Each structure stands twice: as C-alpha cells, then as structure tokens.
C-alpha cells in the first residue's frame, strides 16, 4: 500500500512537471513555410514568438504572457519594411507607438492606453513634424498645425521641428 502511494505521488509529480514545462512550437502553412513559432506553457503562448507571411517574410515578433501580447512588439510589411512598433500590456497597446510609411520612415508617433489614443500624436511628412494632436481616451481634444503655438502651449521650447 505504501509503495503504491509513493508510486502514485511520483507519477503525479512527473505529470505536473511535464505539463508545466515550456515547449517550443512551430506551425506551418500548407506550402511548408513557417507560419509561427514560439513558446507554449500550460497550453498558452508564453514568451517570445515570431509570425510569418505565407511567403516566409517575418510579419511580427514579440512576447506573450498567458496568450496576451506583452512587452515590445514589431510588425513588418510583406516586403520586410517595418510597419509599426510599440508596447503591449495584457494584450492592449500602451505607451508610445511608432508607425512607418512604405519606405520605412516614421510618419506617425502616438501615445496609446488600452488600445486608444491617449496623449500626443505627432504626424510627420518627409521626416519633418507637421501636425500634433492631443487625445484623451480616444477622442481628439486639440490639434496644432502651427508648431510654434504647440511648443508655446506645452512649454516645449527645445522640441525640434
């Protein structure tokens, strides 16, 4: 009887240990190209992941915690040029996000909170700041096209145009 209990406890420990381990997963498209790869723990995406377009080009990369995006993420177009990058917290976009045009130049920087614009959004044209808007919980509350008035209103005398 004692031996059976020890054996059962040992078996349960082995099962628990096996299911709590991180395993590396790869999923493929029908054409054989890699679709996604990353770490699974307790049947959830946990850790660093990469996603690919069907042509094999990197689509996005970043971290998960319990199936939710977290930390810093990068997104790319099918031609490998960066599309956007920014922070996730519990699956929602937060902090500064940078958006790139099709040549890889920043055309938009925006502060987000829980997937909504919250703070400043800066619009660039040919790498030059042209417009600024201020948002609160996704709603635009003010916009500046005259950067001198924006700098004055916000005490930003050192901001480069």
Model-derived features: positions:
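Bacterial Sec-dependent N-terminal signal peptides
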Residues: 1-24
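Glycine/tyrosine- and acidic-biased, solvent-exposed loop/turn segments at the edges of beta-strands
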Residues: 16-161
């Amino acid at each position: 009887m004692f031996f059976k209990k020890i054996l059962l406890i040992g078996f349960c420990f082995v099962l628990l240990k096996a299911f709590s381990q991180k395993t590396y997963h790869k999923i493929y498209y029908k054409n054989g190209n890699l679709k996604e790869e990353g770490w699974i723990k307790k049947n959830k995406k946990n850790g660093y992941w990469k996603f690919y377009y069907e042509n094999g080009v990197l689509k996005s990369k970043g971290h998960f915690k319990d199936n939710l995006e977290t930390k810093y993420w990068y997104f790319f177009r099918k031609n490998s040029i960066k599309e956007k990058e920014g922070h996730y917290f519990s699956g929602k976009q937060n902090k500064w996000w940078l958006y790139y045009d099709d040549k890889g130049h920043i055309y938009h920087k925006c502060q987000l909170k829980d997937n909504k614009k919250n703070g400043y959004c800066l619009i660039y044209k040919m790498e030059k700041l042209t417009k600024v808007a201020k948002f609160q919980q996704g709603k635009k509350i003010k916009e500046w096209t005259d950067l001198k008035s924006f700098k004055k209103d916000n005490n930003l005398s050192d901001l480069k145009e």
